[in-house]
Curated annotation (Swiss-Prot):
It comes from Gorilla gorilla gorilla. It comes from the Eukaryota. SMART domains: PRP. GO terms for cellular component: cell surface; cytosol; dendrite; endoplasmic reticulum; Golgi apparatus; inclusion body; membrane raft; nuclear membrane. This is Major prion protein. A lipid is attached at residue 230 (GPI-anchor amidated serine). It is linked to PrP is found in high quantity in the brain of humans and animals infected with the degenerative neurological diseases kuru, Creutzfeldt-Jakob disease (CJD), Gerstmann-Straussler syndrome (GSS), scrapie, bovine spongiform encephalopathy (BSE), transmissible mink encephalopathy (TME), etc. The gene is PRNP. GO terms for molecular function: amyloid-beta binding; aspartic-type endopeptidase inhibitor activity; copper ion binding; cupric ion binding; cuprous ion binding; glycosaminoglycan binding; identical protein binding; microtubule binding. It is a lipid-anchor; GPI-anchor. Residues 1-22 form the signal peptide. Cu(2+) 3 binds at residues 77-79.
Length: 253
């Protein structure tokens, strides 16, 4: 924590020094330069007092001769011929309208990031989430027959588990127990609907497989949970808050 505080202090000093140098940089202009120290004086040979509004002589608002608001001949507000307010042919909108094309829907990146970080919430399962796909573990069941049966049928068993956020459970055992039950139930119902049935041997092996996968899922969730907690503790400490606040004050000021 002390090393982290030192690095934060070094970063703060470096940023503050850079801001100080930026403020001391001379502004462009001066004698014998391309810029002008006096805004009212143009380049040599040019008009020192151009008319206000950016137009030519006799142009009150930046348009051509007889153009009151910057449009072409007979254009009162800067549009093309027959365009009252600057749009295209038959358009009454601004210059950025393009033949009434519908705007494309924008993707909400916050929602996408939240779904990727927390897993996909499964509708109709009361807040359960579906974990990412896993490789089915190598398990020995104590007999050559069961081991061979598992190798031949492991593709029929789930490779993803259903779970709830770990902060809803008091310990790992409760998390794993609930995870195993809901995963086997959902997989059995889905598979039975397709016309495939499971034997007692299948159920026994699925329980072992899903249990190992639920333990792995708990370890992943636990690691992510503590990482989020550590980040919150770091940025909520008084020294870090003070440094960040002072840095923001220097940038804004």
């Amino acid at each position: 924590m002390a090393n982290l505080g030192c690095w934060m202090l070094v970063l703060f000093v470096a940023t503050w020094s850079d801001l100080g140098l930026c403020k001391k940089r001379p502004k462009p202009g001066g004698w014998n330069t391309g810029g002008s120290r006096y805004p009212g004086q143009g380049s040599p040979g040019g008009n020192r007092y151009p008319p206000q509004g950016g137009g030519g002589w006799g142009q009150p608002h930046g348009g051509g001769w007889g153009q009151p608001h910057g449009g072409g001949w007979g254009q009162p507000h800067g549009g093309g011929w027959g365009q009252p307010h600057g749009g295209g042919w038959g358009q009454g909108g601004g210059t950025h309208s393009q033949w009434n094309k519908p705007s494309k829907p924008k993707t909400n990146m916050k929602h996408m990031a939240g779904a990727a970080a927390a897993g996909a919430v499964v509708g109709g399962l009361g807040g359960y989430m579906l974990g990412s796909a896993m490789s089915r573990p190598i398990i020995h069941f104590g007999s050559d027959y069961e081991d061979r049966y598992y190798r031949e049928n492991m593709h029929r068993y789930p490779n993803q588990v259903y779970y709830r956020p770990m902060d809803q459970y008091s310990n790992q055992n409760n998390f794993v127990h609930d995870c195993v039950n809901i995963t086997i139930k959902q997989h059995t119902v889905t598979t039975t609907t397709k016309g495939e049935n499971f034997t007692e041997t299948d159920v026994k092996m699925m329980e072992r497989v899903v249990e190992q996968m639920c333990i792995t899922q708990y370890e992943r969730e636990s690691q992510a949970y503590y990482q989020r907690g550590s980040s919150m503790v770091l940025f909520s400490s008084p020294p870090v808050i003070l440094l960040i606040s002072f840095l923001i004050f220097l940038i804004v000021g």
